[in-house]
Amino acid sequence: SAQDESVTNVFVAPGNAGTALEPKVTNLSLDTNNFVKVENFCKEKHVELVIIGPEQPLVDGMSDYLQSKGINTFGPSQAAAQLEGSKTFSKDFFIKYGIPTAAYASFNDFDSSKNYLDTIEYPTVVKADGLAAGKGVIICGNKDEALAALDSIFKDQAFGEAGNRVV
């Protein structure tokens, strides 16, 4: 941690007002989706450990990339990050390995998902399959609410590409 005497600098990208107040911490305007820029920064500043927090770089494989370049990294591999990156992948994984999970179905289009609503009990949960910054879950008390959720996800693109499939 930054409190350890052996730590001289902690770089945070992008950081925030709170991290800026911490001793030894420097906020960066570094594009964390550009793996080569992150790699170059780490090598230039002799960074000893990268802790990856945001979901998107993990799902995109930043941990694997940096490790392949000899940079110590704390974060799941790209394959493991798929558990967070795709609700369908997670559900399939749980079923394959006998991990208890709620019943589900996934759909790539509005009409198929709409037809499914007649076969389920309420309340139910409608989720955007992909990364939606923690906002892709809608709890629906009845069919009308579920239809509105599907409309928002598929037709209004409320969650962008994360909503190309729903669970």
Task: Enumerate the language-model features and the residues they cover.
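Short acidic-hydrophobic, aromatic-tinged amphipathic segments that line or gate anion-handling sites
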Residues: 26-33, 105-109, 140
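A general structural signal for well-ordered alpha-helical segments in protein cores
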Residues: 35-38, 59-63, 87-91, 113, ...
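A conserved helix-loop-beta module that forms one wall/lid of the active-site cleft
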Residues: 74-136
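ATP-binding N-terminal substructure of ATP-dependent carboxylate-amine bond-forming enzymes
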Residues: 1-79
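Short coil/turn connectors at secondary-structure junctions
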Residues: 6-8, 46-47, 69-70, 99-101, ...
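Catalytic-core regions of core metabolic enzymes
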Residues: 67-68, 79-80, 112-113, 145, ...
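Conserved ATP-binding module of the ATP-grasp superfamily
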Residues: 100-102, 119, 123-125, 141-167
